[in-house]
Amino acid sequence: MKKWLCAASLGLALAASASVQAAKIAIVNVSRIFQQLPESETVAKQLENEFKGRATELQGMESDLQTKMQKLQRDGSTMKASDRTKLENDVMKQRETFSTKAQAFEQDNRRRQMEERNKILSRIQDAVKSVASKGGYDVVIDANAVAYADPSKDITADVLKQVK
């Protein structure tokens, strides 16, 4: 009875190990796909146009502020005390306004870039899932996360075709 039980458990163990397959792994270069997509350039130009007015306004404010600061340095010692104080206060207020607007501009610009980038990355992710399921891959790893991979395991071109 013990021999039979031992033989049966050994047979089950061998059968279980035989049915376990190695995971089918692929790699994909997401950053290369992102760079090669025409939408990346389109989005960059769109964002540039979206923030162009505010950037121009900030450049004008900066130029005006620099002019006033130069005037204060150049003529400050010969100005009336009241005029110098008025100009100093004006420069401080304008500097604060500029700083606030510049920070808001940077935050808004960064936020919009992330929104658009995430939209594109979502499309890439969907394409990776589709190509992986069609190819029967169990695991897909970003090419930047591995030191070496067999080029035959690279599905970047297939994903790029799917995204375009």
Curated annotation (Swiss-Prot):
Q: What is its main location?
A: periplasm
GO cellular component terms, A-Z: cytosol; periplasmic space
Where, subcellularly, is it found? Periplasm
User: Pfam families, alphabetically?
Assistant: OmpH
Q: Where is this region: Lipopolysaccharide binding?
A: 101-112
One example of the protein's molecular function in GO is: unfolded protein binding
What residue stretch is flagged as signal peptide?
A: 1-22
The record, for SUPFAM superfamilies, names: OmpH-like
Please list the GO biological process terms of this entry: chaperone-mediated protein folding; protein stabilization
Name the InterPro entries for this protein. Chaperone_Skp, Skp_dom_sf
Q: Which keywords label this protein?
A: Chaperone, Periplasm, Signal
Keyword Membrane assigned: no
* NCBIfam families listed in its UniProt record: PRK10780.1 (NF008047)
Family per UniProt? Answer: Belongs to the Skp family.
Q: How does it assemble?
A: Homotrimer.
> What does the UniProt function comment say about this protein?
Molecular chaperone that interacts specifically with outer membrane proteins, thus maintaining the solubility of early folding intermediates during passage through the periplasm.
Instruction: Quote the protein name from its UniProt record.
Output: Chaperone protein Skp
Which species does this protein come from? Yersinia enterocolitica
- Its gene is skp
